[in-house]
Amino acid sequence: MIKREISVRQQTCALLQKNLLKKWRLKRESLMEWVSSLLLLLFLYWYPHGHGATDLSSVPTKDLGRVDSFRQSGFMIGYTPVTSMTQQIMEKVAATPFMADKKVLGLLDEENIKELTESHAEIIRVIFSDTFSYHLKFQFDQRIPTSRELRDHNAHCDGLYEDVNCLIAIFWKEGFVALQAAINAAIIETTTNHSVMEELLSVSGKFMKIHPFVRQEGILTDFFIFTCIISFSPITYYVSINVARERKRMKGLMMMMGLRDPAFWLSWGLLYAGFVFIMALSLALVIKSVQFFILTSFMVVFSLFLLYGLSMITLAFLMSALVRKSVLTGLSVFLLTIFWGSLGFTSLYRYLPAPVEWTLSLFSPFAFTLGMAQLLRVDYDLNSNAPPDPASGSNLIIATNFMLVFDAFLYLALMMYFEKVLPNEYGHQHSPLFFLKSSFWLQTRKPAHVILEDGIDPVPSSGDSFEPVSPEFHGKESIRIRNISKEYKGKPNKIEALKDLTLDIYEGQITAVLGHSGAGKSTLLNILSGLSVPTKGSVTIYNNNLSEMADLENILRIAGVCPQANVQFDFLTVRENLRLFAKIRGIPPQDVEKEVQRVLLELEMKNIQNILAQNLSGGQKRKLTFGIAILGDSQIFLLDEPTAGLDPFSRHRVWNLLKERRADRVVLFSTQFMDEADILADRKVFISNGRLKCAGSSLFLKKKWGVGYHLSLQLKEVCVPENITSLVKQHIPAAKLSAEGEGKLLYTLPLETTYRFPELCQSLDSCPGLGIENYGVSMTTLNEVFLKLEGKASIDEPEVDIVGEGQTERSGDTERLMEMEQTLSSLRETEKTDGMALWRQQTCAIAKVRLLKLKHERKTLLSVLLILVVGICPFLFENISTKIRQSSYTWELSPHDYFLAPGQQPQGMLTQLLIINKTEASIDDFIHSVERQNIALEVDASGTRDGTDDPSYNGALIVSGNEKNHSFSFACNTKRLNCFPVLMDILSNGLLGMVKPSARIQTDRSTYLMDETIHPLEDLWKTAFWLILTSACPPYIAMSSVTDYKNRAWFQLRVSGLFPSAYWVGQAMVDIPLYCFVFLFMSLMDYLFRFPDTMFSIISHVIQIPCSVGYAISLIFLTYVISFISRKGKKNSGIWSLSFYIITVFSVAVILLAFDVDGTQYYIIFLIPPSTLVGCLILSLHLFIGQIFEEGQVIEPFLVFLIPFLHVFIFIFTLRCLEWKFGKKTMRKDPIFRISPRNNDVYQNPEEPEDEDEDVQMERMRTANALVSTSFDEKPVIIASCLRKEYAGKQKHCLSKKKAKIATRNVSFCVRKGEILGLLGHNGAGKSTSLKMISGDTKVTAGQVLLKGSREGDTPGFLGYCPQENALWPNLTVKEHLEIFAAVRGLRKSHAAVAITRLADALKLQDQLKSPVKTLSEGVKRKLCFVLSILGNPSILLLDEPSTGLDPEGQQQIWQAIRAIIKNTDRGALLTTHYMAEAEALCDRVAILVSGRLRCIGSIQHLKSKFGKDYLLEMKVKTLEQVEPLNTEILRLFPQASRQERYSSLMAYKLPVEAVQPLSQAFFKLEKVKQTFDLEEYSLSQSTLEQVFLELSKEQELDGLELEELDSSIKWKLLPQEEA
């Protein structure tokens, strides 16, 4: 046994290599990931962010002149309230020079002013609070800035040549300061009788010197930052998708094989950390190249982006642990990025206090935006008056980087915590406080192979239903199961999969778990392998408690698990898959390759080791999954149907491998093949409905529930069965005739009468006149035991007859067969609709399918809902912004916004007020008056300063003149928006304080919004926006056909007789109304938010309604065309939706820009369908405002509105042409598309048949004759002539040629009326390919296929096709499937209901009729597919492994149905199978395919006679020690015996006919051997079909074909007849 040591490092490296291979091989996905990132980089590089440095220092400071130089007109002033004081004040204001010719009106209240506003263009409102307090109210966005204050990143000035314009000048130039000065002077004069009007109106204003500064253009820079925030979104989206998908599909299975959590996350983390590094480096280079950050170094920018990207990767990991669905994971990460990143703009605009900012930095997008804001402030600090503090800025940036690092580790910790605490897909979880337990930190590994001597509860005795365990196994109870129950939540009741199951599994034994479909076998194995958690009960495996997570890890460390679903990565080769899982399982690196080669050799997979897993056949995938399970030579093997889908030869290889590993190990497997359990398992455990029913060895079970031995007699043409029966009963009176068929009798002989066999055989040999050709004796089978157990209410009831394998039938089965025949024959009489009535019925059925699917397509509905929400956003934003604008606000003009108070420490942007005295006299009175306003002053008494040279002050007040007559001027820092109004109040209060110290004038600025009458055309952009947006909906609505194509439902419908046009029209019946609902909803919103009482609005809606309907239909059918063309790829609804949106945006832009060019708009509207509706809207706009159309040309644009309907016809015709050229074969003439069933084209086969068997040559001649036969009655129902199929291969390298993969070569056969032909062969031999060519699913490369209809000259209206893959809709119920296919096949509703009920009763599907398919077991799904294939009584049945996954009872039901449908009718069936008993039970003839060639064909008896003339002696020994002595004895008794390579405990010998003649002597010798060696059982009979199959496959060798060819390793050399 290989010593395994699980290493996180080794697992991480293996998974990282796997991820790199995935990125390399799935180039399309990788390209999309990097193209998205590259587009963002290019966008940032070319984006006009408007961010840069401005240097106006060389421009002279600007003098704004006197304040009373304002001379604008066109407005009037309204004030309120009207009092004597306010009236005096405003009269003085009206008398000022600049107010000449301007009205000043006093009104009672502000409402009166509003009424006055309606009749005047502009009114400036003066609202007095008291005599000294008022606010000036201007119309919004008129005469004053819209913002309260300049932000530190705003461009406060711009310069052109020698002219400098600054935002603060608007107060001066637009009259605010002039009006403020006049009102302030009037207040002073009215209240003090001291006039200062001249002093205030003569004030002049200047700008301080403008230092270089970094500017931004507001929203442009914000959007640039927003793009940086989402720059890692493509990476986080794909990491979310990849991690969530792999976590859901494969992680649990890998954990079951020993994977450690850190290795999984590290492998993806390291890969995407590399991606993040490249992206961060590129982003930093782009940002520095466009000079978005000017003073910040490259490494600082790079580190910020790198840490942000890494934190976003960890955030994606966290969300994948919280949100299980991959799409929702990616969407949630994206939405979180947008939300928290957008919220981070509050830090850029300083809306939040610092503690809140650092708290919100726990969300990395917010922390990143905060970091971007801090880097911007490094540049913006140039704008500040405060001295720069580089250390403070660096510390903040370092702190932000630390927060991003902290976020990454926090997300990782939370991810690991929730990964442990939240139940995974298998139900396992730790306790919420698991990290507080010492066992979590100090794990101690228990001894791996300690077996509990004493269990808590002994296995309950159930009478004689359980065989006592041999004493040698006492103390070897390695798996102890106690009272295990498992419940699943269902509707309406819970489903109990296991019920109080108690069982011991022993070391050194192979144990098989048997039971019907849904009995609980897979549930039990899933619980033992950690894939499911029991509802109650306990399980211990080698002293490890399964319910403890630490113990579960110990169990999985020593277990090899083969789950029911195949385990492989499709993008890896077979060898790469094995290497990966070998490393995961902890095999030392130096032994990995050796172990992989061992598995490849033992399972004979070396020839396919370099083939991608996705290209393997079903059997080869199963073999790979089993190979993964046996890697590392585990102590425990838990195998769930390990040989399902394997051919007999591969199945025997698996059996031998398990038998060789039995010693000192535990092997527990489940199977539906009773023969497999009989041969392989030492102990069989039967489970029924979740309860343990019986357990024991084959001999124990057969003795208790078997029927004894079977005597099989092959008869000559002339015989009397009654005489034979009489002879048999003469020797064995208890013998029963259990079956009588054509040329065959089958008797059941009791077990206790074996001693009479020699006498019976002697009598049979001595009576040649009875007409017996040969005979054989075989033991009862486990199939019979199973059916007997399932047919009894309880084990203790009296025994009843059972069905044996092959063609064994009991009387009860004969009755059921007759009942089945009656049921199916009654259904044959049902009338079917045709023509247009059938088309309408099919259309309604497809519409029903689409509607039922839509109910469960949450992604589609959420996507459409999101588009609706985004479409409503402009209306909502417009309304919100209108409400904001309409709400008046008042901003106080306070000196403390800019200037320090006396004694206050410098902080922020506050400075002292600079007063410069140029009067050469004392102005102490004025200075003291200003100081009384609580302002810190710096006085230049000497007057040496200019006031404009030093912008470190926010403002300066310059006093000039002489001692008696002072004049004043202001110098303002251009970055302080309200500087001039604030200085005017300071000056006014300074002058007022000199006269009346206690008084203070307070001016506020305010705005009001005009009640605008919005022209309807101004709302056009909102309508255009949602119309453009809704053009992105169809890919989310109308691409359901891609899913149907992927799950094969499309072809299943087509082969069932569906008209192509009915499929598309049925889809459209749901998709078009859904799309129209989108238009209706958005039109309603548009109407509600608009002004509907306008002529344009009414007419535009009248135009839009028919145009929108046509547009909706045209886009839906355009999407159908796209989905048909791209049906073989991924659905990609999102990509197509984005494409529609971008195309529409650019088309509309071209229409608007090139409208003056004659005809351009018409070409675009016609050639680009998504832009049609918006284009028509723009045309209607120009039509009704009369801007382009002259009188007499009105009809032409109206014809443009019919373009969508022209598109509808074009796309429907295109769809029809695509169906005709590239669609699958149609079974009926389509009444709408006018597509008829195609004449089968004949393609010459390039190969001539060589070295064919004579039976194959005769079949080829028979097929050729049938092709030219004119007799309808004699024509076979299926004719396959010279079929060849080649698949395009792949190039090994760029210079090599593509080598075709040949699946079938020159295969010819026909199926006659009433015949069932079986196709046999190894995995990948070409069986399924042959069926696909006959059904029309795959186009033949060469050859011809003819299918016979029910009437002469007709093709069959539909085929009964049961494909290898279940072509079902997961969310639809069984009954809905049956109703839909019944409608498609033409059954009337009433007849369909009867047919569904009868078929459900016949095949035991009544309890599952209302269950969704996704909740069904694989066996029930398979049964449903079969029922769908026989529904409507098709004339031809194509059955591809129809009974795979079914229990014996289900197999019997299907076999009976097939026989009832085909036998003695004009129907025919072609069947493929790996189950030889199925072929023997059903097939009239079988054909064996090898490497795509037909090697032999004929009846089963003919093949047995030709290739299996010898007798086969099989003996089952109880211990391996008996093998050699028994072999010696057999060779002594039968010297000509040839031992066959069969199975270690099942000894098989080929005996020539002469060696066993007479048979009586042979049985006499064998009875003696049985008693001497205490054999478990023996069988002497002619070769079965499986034995013939294995005999032929013994002498296989490598074919001369290349490895690319299908099943290239198998070349059969048929034994010549004389050698047989």
Swiss-Prot record:
The protein's GO terms of the molecular function aspect are: ABC-type transporter activity; ABC-type xenobiotic transporter activity; ATP binding; ATP hydrolysis activity
EC no. given is 7.6.2.-
Alphabetized UniProt keyword annotations: ATP-binding, Cell membrane, Glycoprotein, Lipid transport, Membrane, Nucleotide-binding, Repeat, Translocase, Transmembrane, Transmembrane helix, Transport
Any GO BP annotation? cholesterol efflux
- TM stretches of this protein: 30-50, 223-243, 267-287, 298-318, 326-346, 352-372, 396-416, 860-880, 979-999, 1023-1043, 1069-1089, 1105-1125, 1135-1155, 1164-1184, 1194-1214
Factors inducing expression: Down-regulated by digoxin.
Q: What InterPro entries does the annotation carry?
A: AAA+_ATPase (IPR003593), ABC2_TM (IPR013525), ABC_transporter-like_ATP-bd (IPR003439), ABC_transporter-like_CS (IPR017871), ABCA (IPR026082), P-loop_NTPase (IPR027417), R2_ABCA1-4-like (IPR056264)
What is the annotated localization of this protein?
Answer: Cell membrane; Basolateral cell membrane
CDD domains on file = ABC_subfamily_A
On whether Zinc-finger is a keyword of this UniProt record, the answer is: no
Give the top-level enzyme category.
Answer: translocase
**Which residues are glycosylated according to the annotation?**
723
Tell me which residues bind ATP 1: 515-522
> What's the catalysed reaction?
taurocholate(in) + ATP + H2O = taurocholate(out) + ADP + phosphate + H(+); cholesterol(in) + ATP + H2O = cholesterol(out) + ADP + phosphate + H(+)
Cellular compartments per GO CC: basolateral plasma membrane; endoplasmic reticulum; mitochondrial inner membrane; plasma membrane
Identify its membrane topology class: Multi-pass membrane protein
Activity regulation information from UniProt = Cholesterol efflux is increased by extracellularly applied taurocholate.
What's the main place this protein lives? Answer: membrane
Q: In which tissues is it expressed?
A: Expressed in heart, brain, lung, liver and skeletal muscle. Highly expressed in the liver, and is also abundant in heart and skeletal muscle. Highly expressed in liver.
Q: Where is the ABC transporter domain?
A: 479-714, 1283-1516
Question: Does this UniProt record's set of keywords contain Membrane?
Answer: yes
Q: Where does ATP 2 bind?
A: 1321-1328
Role this protein plays: Mediates cholesterol and taurocholate efflux. Through the interaction with ABCA1 potentiates the cholesterol efflux to lipid-free APOA1, in turn regulates high-density lipoprotein cholesterol levels.
Q: What family name appears in the similarity comment?
A: Belongs to the ABC transporter superfamily. ABCA family.
PANTHER family, alphabetized: ABC-TYPE ORGANIC ANION TRANSPORTER ABCA8 (PTHR19229:SF274), ATP-BINDING CASSETTE TRANSPORTER SUBFAMILY A ABCA (PTHR19229)
Q: What is this protein called?
A: ABC-type organic anion transporter ABCA8B
Q: Which organism is it from?
A: Mus musculus
The opening ranks of the lineage are: Eukaryota, Metazoa, Chordata, Craniata, Vertebrata
